Amino acid sequence: MSGMGDGYVGTAQDAVRIRRLQKQREAERKKIQELKSKSASGNDQSGLLQFGTSSCEILDTAFKKETVGLVTREEYVEKRVNIRNKFEEEEKEKLQKLQQEEEELQLEKRNKKRKIKGSSRLSFAEDFENGSDEDDGENKSSGTGNLRCGKLGKDPSVETNFLPDSEREAEEQAERERLKKQWLREQEQIKNEPLEITYSYWDGTGHRRVIQVRKGDPIGNFLRAVQQQLAPDFREIRTASVENLLYVKEDLIIPHQHSFYELIINKARGKSGPLFHFDVHEDVRTIADATIEKDESHAGKVVERHWYEKNKHIFPASRWEIYDPTKKWERYTVHGD
């Protein structure tokens, strides 16, 4: 490439940038040299400064030109002071002028850099713009027009949903909070819904009853209501505490802390049927195909703990076990384990 060394291996944009920087440095060097020459030649305006002379010699020369003939001491001193003051004022004005020109030059450089930086956000856009300026300067004589690259901007057709957006994230967070509160309200409504439960008090034989509770009630509250319902008819229930009553559903002993809502929403499964149905369907597997699973529910049993401990080796108590939410029953069975 012309103007570059034999070992240069840069791109065309790099070459354009190098030529531009060289021209800028050359222009600045010339401007500084002109300022120095101007400051040296400007001394001739008042006739006080000459090349190679000191300030004392300049003052003496000016005093001799201003003083002709005999003068008094007072006139001599006054002229001497006036010439010195005039010399100092001229020097001060020249210094201020040089400083002002230097400040204007620095300001012009800063404005130029700021303009280049603001015109493009990509580094190569500056090279294209300045390169086109140089081409325009070289081709002015041939009458070619300016060829400039337009400023780079955003493409509205580009998908930007994956980019971080604090406003969009705040809206999504607010929507999640709204949906969460709505879901919690709906669950509270479900928990407050009435639930009719068919159960059987079991003391070796069944005594079926129906009672109504809320879906959100735990098993302990249900057994307390059962005790109040059975107390008039069964003396052993009147003297038993709620902690000594067991609720057995589908051959599983449900601990007191679990709620009906929990069993319903999780669609819990027992050994012999679903734990989330509390009405009663007759078991037809004894007269139909037992290999086909039926969605049938049996009346849960309420038993006294003392009776269970005494008869747990006898069917049906021998099949009962503690309910474990993590244990999954793949199929329902009526007899055996």
Curated annotation (Swiss-Prot):
The modification Phosphoserine is found at S132. The modification N-acetylserine is found at S2. Residues 126-137 have a biased composition (Acidic residues). One of its GO terms (biological process) is ethylene-activated signaling pathway. Disruption phenotype: Shortened circadian period. The clock is hypersensitive to red but shows normal responses to blue light. By contrast, inhibition of hypocotyl elongation is hyposensitive to red light but hypersensitive to blue light. Residues 23-37, 165-174 have a biased composition (Basic and acidic residues). It comes from the Eukaryota. Induction: Post transcriptionally regulated. No circadian-regulation at the mRNA level, but fluctuation of the protein levels, with the highest level found shortly after dawn. Residues 13-41, 72-121 form a coiled coil. InterPro entries: FAM50A/XAP5_C, XAP5. It is found in: Nucleus. Residues 23-47, 125-174 are annotated as: Disordered. Keywords: Acetylation, Biological rhythms, Coiled coil, Nucleus, Phosphoprotein. It holds the Pfam family XAP5. Expressed in leaves stems, flowers, roots, trichomes and hypocotyls. GO terms for cellular component: nucleus. Residues 38-47 have a biased composition (Polar residues). Involved in light regulation of the circadian clock and photomorphogenesis. May play a global role in coordinating growth in response to the light environment. Acts as a light quality sensor directing both negative and positive transcriptional regulation. Inhibits growth in red light but promote growth in blue light. Inhibits clock gene expression in diurnal cycles. Plays no role in the control of flowering time. Belongs to the FAM50 family. This is Protein XAP5 CIRCADIAN TIMEKEEPER. It comes from Arabidopsis thaliana.
